[in-house]
């Protein structure tokens, strides 16, 4: 049995609470800042209403997942609720349209961490006998009643685009945004390159302009750097009929991507070819670890195999 937060084994000698929750006590403290795993004070009716709102707005993957901002209340019992402020967490439940989205996102985030990509704090929880995905917001620090806010702007905003145009752009545009606004452009450009390579390898065709952001490093200082990665999904596996391999254009295209396209992109970013090849080689060498992560994930066996086959095929293109 593995912890739903850190992914490490829960000892057979662990207390019954850890085994029941499938969370280490230390992981509960790290993620929620509490001694006990919060109970989810969210009803089936609220989840159903969220589903209806999502469908009515036409918000499905690719696009916007069902999600709700939630508050951690410690007044009487430790619980997660949607009625109070401040909302320090985001919860993503299961959907009828696409099965196992929480499990897919959890796997994708864990593989990103294996690749050396910094990710937002995230985990799985059990709710109504199903997995839900939960992430902690990084644009605020909440300590009791004290809240510190950090400015965070996504690339759609920084490019002056409407949300509806989040797929109309290129990764070269993302590089220009970083060069213009980041206080660490060299580091962030290399990180951008790594994330685009990783997105291709794992079938994430949904890394659009709103899924990249710059965030203040110190509240109120306006010292922006590329934020930690979030909203990572292997859409090419979830929706096999999606023919596009990337959300934005790379070297002028979204499909039939080849290794040379990444090299040309690196040159446009000002990344030396040798450095770009080293990054791609590093990601390819992690193939076996990605496959192990798939095997250890909470996806059904068929979905695990589909995920592994995609990684193997994409690695051959990058190799």
Q: Where is each model-derived feature located?
A:
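A glycine-rich phosphate-binding loop feature that marks nucleotide/adenosyl-phosphate handling sites
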Residues: 127-130, 211-217, 283
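A residue-level signal for conserved active-site and pocket-lining positions in enzyme catalytic cores
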Residues: 70, 112, 155, 206, ...
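ATP-dependent phospho-/nucleotidyl transfer catalytic cores
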Residues: 128-201, 248, 264, 268
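Mobile late-domain/C-terminal helix-loop "cap" segments
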Residues: 251-312, 318
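Regulatory N- and C-terminal appendages and interdomain linkers associated
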Residues: 1-48, 52-54, 220, 224, ...
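Conserved kinase catalytic-core segment
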Residues: 97-113, 170-237
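Catalytic-core segments of enzymes that bind and process phosphorylated/nucleotide-bearing substrates
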Residues: 154-177, 214-274
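Conserved ATP-binding subdomain of kinase catalytic cores across diverse folds
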Residues: 46-166, 274
């Amino acid at each position: 049995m593995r912890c739903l937060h850190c992914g490490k084994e829960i000892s057979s000698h662990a207390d019954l609470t850890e085994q029941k929750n499938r969370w280490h006590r230390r992981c509960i403290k790290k993620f929620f800042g509490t001694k006990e795993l919060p109970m989810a004070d969210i009803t089936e009716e609220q989840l159903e209403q969220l589903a209806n709102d999502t469908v009515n707005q036409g918000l499905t993957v690719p696009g916007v997942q069902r999600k709700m901002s939630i508050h951690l209340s410690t007044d009487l019992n430790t619980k997660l609720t949607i009625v109070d402020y401040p909302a320090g967490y985001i919860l993503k439940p299961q959907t009828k349209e696409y099965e196992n989205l929480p499990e897919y996102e959890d796997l994708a985030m864990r593989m990103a961490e294996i690749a050396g990509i910094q990710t937002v704090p995230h985990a799985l929880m059990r709710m109504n006998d199903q997995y839900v995905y939960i992430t902690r917001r990084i644009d605020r620090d909440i300590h009791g009643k004290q809240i510190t806010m950090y400015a965070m702007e996504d690339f759609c905003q920084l490019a002056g685009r409407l949300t509806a145009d989040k797929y109309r752009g290129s990764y070269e545009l993302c590089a220009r945004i970083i060069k213009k606004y980041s206080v660490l452009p060299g580091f962030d450009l290399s990180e951008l390159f790594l994330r685009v390579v990783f997105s291709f390898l794992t079938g994430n065709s949904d890394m659009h302009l709103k899924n990249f952001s710059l965030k203040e490093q110190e509240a109120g200082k306006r010292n922006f750097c590329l934020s930690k990665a979030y909203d990572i999904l292997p859409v090419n596996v979830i929706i096999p009929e999606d023919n596009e391999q990337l959300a934005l254009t790379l070297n002028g295209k979204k499909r039939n991507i080849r290794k040379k396209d990444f090299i040309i992109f690196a040159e446009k970013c000002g990344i030396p070819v040798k450095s770009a090849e080293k990054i791609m080689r590093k990601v390819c060498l992690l193939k076996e670890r990605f496959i192990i992560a798939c095997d250890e994930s909470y996806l059904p066996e068929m979905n695990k195999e589909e995920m592994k086959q995609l990684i193997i095929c994409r690695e051959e293109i990058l190799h």
